[in-house]
């Protein structure tokens, strides 16, 4: 098949005067430096620009595969919920937006969750797919998050959250906002069970997601250069009529002001998480999969 694909087909196309089929997005441009990077090199480097270290948005499926040992994990089923309960329409029907996002991402909604081993330690991981309607939090996403927390409680294992979101999904109105207290309750249930909850803040983490489960972790790790906020910089400046500091709302700024615990390069996150979780769960070095609950807080 390789001989036919690599030799015969190009010769036939050349004889017939056909142009070779070139896939789109072979080269990716760094938003920070303008550097062009071959897409395969970018994928191999975990969507981090090699020269500048700029962290591009990483697809949810790729992040889960990178996190778990050998890329092997059990994907949690997406809960079935009502579609477009408000019959919402702006410039486009909400149902059409859902259909387009599903075709683009090959996901039912923004949340992907899985159970697997991280350096031998069983964990539940929850990841936002930003390409699905800007990772917005709606009924389906909220239900998926709650189910993931319930699974972590039943398995008695830690949960790691990777938010990347523009906030609550406006097309679902108050039903979307209801997911903020629901997910907050789920976080509290995990903590009451004595299991660690670590949040890895990625670019961007904003709005209602920041106002709920994204800022309730036992430890908050942030990727370099990530925008982390509730309201955007422009909105705040227009409200207070003052210029905000340089780098305001970036992960580095939040680290300096005590809002996050550490800023870690994406390529180092799996090892960092594994080391941290083994300490937090008191997992024996010779049996990393044995999870001991944290002591209840006073």
UniProtKB/Swiss-Prot annotation:
Keywords: ATP-binding, Cytoplasm, Fatty acid biosynthesis, Fatty acid metabolism, Lipid biosynthesis, Lipid metabolism, Nucleotide-binding, Transferase. It is found in: Cytoplasm. Its EC number is 2.1.3.15. It catalyses: N(6)-carboxybiotinyl-L-lysyl-[protein] + acetyl-CoA = N(6)-biotinyl-L-lysyl-[protein] + malonyl-CoA. InterPro entries: AcCoA_carboxyl_beta, Acetyl_CoA_COase_Trfase_b_su, ClpP/crotonase-like_dom_sf, COA_CT_N. The keyword Lipid metabolism applies. One of its GO terms (molecular function) is ATP binding. It comes from the Bacteria. Residues 26-295 form the CoA carboxyltransferase N-terminal domain. Its main location: cytoplasm. One of its GO terms (biological process) is fatty acid biosynthetic process. GO terms for cellular component: acetate CoA-transferase complex. This is Acetyl-coenzyme A carboxylase carboxyl transferase subunit beta. The lineage of its organism: Bacteria, Pseudomonadati, Pseudomonadota, Alphaproteobacteria, Hyphomicrobiales. The gene is accD.
């Amino acid at each position: 098949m390789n001989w036919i694909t690599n030799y015969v087909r190009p010769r036939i196309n050349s004889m017939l005067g056909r142009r070779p089929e070139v896939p789109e997005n072979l080269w990716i441009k760094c938003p920070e430096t303008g550097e062009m990077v071959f897409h395969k090199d970018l994928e191999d480097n975990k969507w981090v620009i090699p020269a500048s270290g700029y962290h591009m948005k990483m697809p949810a499926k790729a992040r889960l595969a990178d996190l778990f040992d050998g890329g092997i994990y059990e994907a949690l089923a997406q809960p079935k919920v009502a579609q477009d309960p408000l019959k919402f329409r702006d410039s486009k029907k909400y149902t059409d937006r859902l259909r387009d996002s599903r075709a683009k991402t090959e996901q039912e909604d923004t949340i992907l969750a899985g159970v697997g081993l991280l350096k031998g330690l069983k964990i539940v991981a929850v990841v936002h797919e930003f390409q699905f309607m800007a990772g917005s939090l709606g009924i389906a996403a909220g239900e998926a998050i709650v189910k993931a927390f319930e699974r972590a409680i039943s398995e008695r294992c830690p949960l790691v959250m990777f938010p990347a979101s523009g906030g609550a999904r406006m097309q679902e109105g108050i039903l979307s906002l209801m997911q903020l207290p629901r997910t907050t309750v789920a976080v509290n249930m995990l903590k009451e069970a004595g299991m660690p909850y670590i949040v890895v803040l990625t670019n961007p983490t904003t709005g209602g997601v920041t106002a709920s489960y994204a800022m309730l972790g036992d430890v908050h790790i942030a990727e370099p250069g990530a925008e982390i906020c509730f309201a955007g910089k422009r909105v705040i400046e227009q409200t207070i009529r003052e210029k905000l500091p340089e780098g305001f709302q970036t992960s580095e700024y939040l680290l300096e002001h005590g809002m996050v615990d550490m800023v870690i390069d994406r390529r180092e996150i799996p090892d960092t998480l594994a080391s941290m979780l083994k300490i937090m769960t008191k997992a024996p070095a010779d049996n990393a999969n044995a999870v001991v609950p944290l002591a209840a807080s006073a």
